Swiss-Prot record:
This is Ubiquitin carboxyl-terminal hydrolase 20. GO terms for molecular function: cysteine-type deubiquitinase activity. The lineage of its organism: Eukaryota, Viridiplantae, Streptophyta, Embryophyta, Tracheophyta. The keyword Hydrolase applies. Its EC number is 3.4.19.12. Signal peptide: none annotated. Residues 1-20, 42-162, 556-585, 674-695 are annotated as: Disordered. It comes from Arabidopsis thaliana. It holds the Pfam family UCH. Keywords: Hydrolase, Protease, Thiol protease, Ubl conjugation pathway. The active site is at residues 185, 435.
């Protein structure tokens, strides 16, 4: 056990400066926290399609902060509404009616409570605007009281020129929102921070995907999946996307993770970064100098000093983010000071120098800094009965210098200054209940709030007043996401134009933007890898696909890209048809290129050899290859349809039954015994497979 003693020295390791950090200036230090609290709609976990409870509206005070809600027996709890006057209304990410009015595919009956209202509130009457609580669906509920008089009290204040009120500007320059698939807010909040991490994007651009990858799982590649996710999030359509890749593979990251169950965002962050590090362990797979390990991985040095002979032993520990105690601190700097403080060990240990069993002192210092420093503020502690949340505001700076907490100066004069660009916040009173959302800083003075599928512009002072849970700091000199976003947009649009018209199936969408852009492909158990690292063995039926084309053939042959660009690797990974097509669902890209054609409701696979991939490098060769494969498919289809062949060619049928079919009336319904024997003969000679099975 580590205990801090007042009489221990300030440091037992050589340091370039004192352990006491320089005072870090924060914004609005004297400003009241109560005046900066955002609209926290509810701390109880409830379904998001409930209307606002009107009983609580009468008691709301716009200038006060409500205390955490009491814990009730069972899952159901009443809504506890926290609100205040906001300087300016947030800018909602709304979509036009002709752009995103496509039904959302319901993937499970457990998602019945997911909010079906994806439109903005500006199109509805002022007195009937719906309210969605800031919680994840899955447990509990809010009261369902509708009262027009009470709802009218919550209307925004109308200006004197109400008829000429200016409409809010659309949100641009950031990624799209993410649908809540059922208590998946912990995943959404972390991935929004990943999507806007510039060093991570740069490392993904330089990654060369190999088959098989180094993830240790042939069915799921973390790097390929996160690349695909970021590409989909930066599409210009700005429709929210559904992260089925990761949601359906939560068990891959940890056996404790279950779908539709609220998980801890920090635990998921650590599990994801661990898998990302394993997948990117081969540095030769990265063409650039930045690897996925360099983005988040740092190193600590641990020093043990013998209190008898003053001998100091040093060991190095790999670190992916720091977990900081906040119970006795009020700023991020003081939390780091407490983390690097010298502590005296209660247990006596044997000294390697004097060979005596003596007391020792321990100190942790930063030795190597990553490109992105993550800090986890420990807001949950075990009180003996359950995990209790620490409701305490910790002041976080926009900029921080980590030099005072390091052992020595970084090599090659690497900067030790970092700027805040993202954070994750938790609402609620327990680690198992509540809601997660994230805040992203895309430019020095531009912040956005990502609350699942909703993306709004938010003031910087409002962000700094939140009770943050996970902090993301980028090293000084790192480009802002807004500049990277502008560079990637032309390449994103080019990838849309270069998408093959035969890469999709017939659909009734007619090119409209889906309200739910999904990049999930079928079931996830025992299936080969698809283009984004997601397993896919059982082929979907025709109606499950979404398309922009009226073609009847699906082509997903792999081909290599002849040119390389700084940003093109993310947008055009490995093959042109593998790029994400807006408002479409990706088809699998297994270790063997699979050609599929639709005849009626069945799929006929044609497996191509790997050496044939180069033949599809040019458009003409690709079209010629496609025609040849279509002819081959037709011949294969005829050979696999024994019911269209003379019945005399069918073997293993009893003579009596054969005579009944050959010479009898074919329109006559056969006997059950004859039907059974015929089915056996057809299965022996071959029949169209209902599902594609790959061993």
């Amino acid at each position: 056990m580590l205990m801090a003693k007042p009489d221990v020295p300030s440091s037992i390791l050589p340091r370039s400066s004192s352990i006491l950090p320089n005072s870090i200036e924060t914004l609005d230090e004297n400003e009241s926290i109560e005046a900066q609290v955002n609209n926290v709609q509810s701390l109880a976990l409830s379904s998001p399609n409930r209307d606002r409870s009107d009983d609580d509206d009468n008691n709301n005070n716009h200038d006060s902060v409500s205390i955490p809600p009491p814990i009730y027996d069972g899952y159901s709890s009443s809504s506890s509404d926290e609100s205040q006057s906001v300087p300016s209304p947030p800018i909602n990410l709304d979509h036009d009616d002709d752009e995103c009015q496509i039904p959302i595919r319901n993937t499970s009956q457990a998602l019945d409570d997911i909010d079906d209202d994806i439109w903005g509130d500006d199109d509805l009457p002022e007195t009937r605007r719906p309210w969605t609580p800031n919680v994840s669906p899955g447990f509990g509920s809010d009261d369902d009281d509708d009262n027009d008089d009470d709802n009218s009290k919550n209307e925004p204040r109308k200006s004197l020129f109400y008829g000429f009120r200016q409409e809010p500007e659309p949100v641009t320059g950031v990624g799209a929102g993410l649908w809540n698939l059922g208590n998946s807010c912990f995943l959404n909040s972390v991935f929004q921070c990943f999507t806007h991490t510039v060093p991570l994007i740069e490392s993904l651009l330089s990654f060369r995907y190999e088959v098989p990858c180094h993830c240790g799982n042939e069915f799921f590649c973390v790097i390929r999946a996160i690349r695909y996710h970021i590409e989909a999030a930066l599409r210009p359509e700005r429709c929210p996307i559904a992260p089925y890749f990761f949601f359906d593979n939560l068990n891959y990251f940890s056996p404790d993770f279950q779908r539709y169950q609220q998980e801890d965002a920090h635990e998921f962050l650590q599990a994801f970064l661990e898998k990302l590090e394993i997948c990117g362990s081969d540095r030769t797979s990265f063409r650039g100098d930045i690897t996925s390990q360099d983005v988040f991985s740092g190193r600590l040095i641990s020093g043990l000093r013998c209190c008898n002979c003053d001998y100091v032993s040093e060991t190095y520990e790999k670190s992916v983010g720091l977990s900081l105690e906040i119970e006795d601190v009020d700023t991020l700097g003081s939390a780091l000071e407490s983390f690097t403080r010298v502590e005296k060990l209660d247990e006596q240990l044997t000294c390697d120098n004097c060979n005596e069993k003596v007391s020792k002192e321990k100190q942790l210092l930063l030795d190597k800094l990553p490109l992105v420093a993550t800090f986890h503020l420990k807001r949950f502690k075990n009180n003996g009965l359950y995990m209790e949340k620490i409701y305490k505001h910790v002041k976080i700076p926009l900029e921080i210098d980590l030099q005072p907490y390091m052992r020595n100066i970084q090599e090659n004069e690497v900067s030790t200054k970092y700027h805040l660009y993202a954070l994750v916040e938790h609402f609620g009173y327990s680690v198992a209940y509540g809601h997660y959302s994230s805040y992203v800083r895309s430019a020095p003075k531009i912040w956005h709030h990502f609350d699942d599928s909703k993306v709004t512009r938010i003031d910087e002072d409002m962000v700094l007043s939140q009770d943050s849970y996970i902090l993301f700091y980028a090293r000084e000199g790192t480009r802002w996401f807004s500049s990277v976003y502008e560079e990637m947009q032309p390449l994103v649009e080019a990838s849309l134009l270069n998408s093959s018209p035969k890469s999709v199936l017939d659909s009734s969408t007619n090119g409209e933007c889906l309200s739910e852009i999904s990049y999930e492909n079928g079931d996830k158990a025992s299936k080969p890898c698809d283009s984004a690292g997601v397993c896919n063995q059982h082929v979907k039926t025709k109606e499950d696909f979404v398309s922009l084309s009226n073609d009847d053939v699906f082509l997903s042959a792999e081909s290599s890209s002849g040119e390389e660009s700084p940003m093109g690797e993310l947008l055009d990974p490995l093959d042109p048809d593998d790029s994400y097509s807006p408002c479409t669902e990706k088809e699998s890209d297994s270790c063997l290129a699979i050609e599929r054609a639709t005849i009626r409701d069945d799929f006929f696979p044609l497996l191509l050899d790997q050496n044939q991939e180069s033949s599809t490098s040019s458009p003409k060769l690709q079209e010629r290859t496609f025609e040849m494969q279509l002819l081959q498919m037709e011949e294969t289809t005829k050979s696999q349809e024994p019911w269209k062949q003379p019945l005399s060619s069918i073997s293993n049928i009893a003579d009596s039954m054969e005579a009944e079919f050959v010479y009898g009336d074919l329109m006559k319904k056969p006997s059950p015994r004859a039907r059974e024997l015929l089915d056996q003969a057809i299965s022996t000679n071959g029949s169209p497979p209902k599902k594609l099975k790959t061993t």
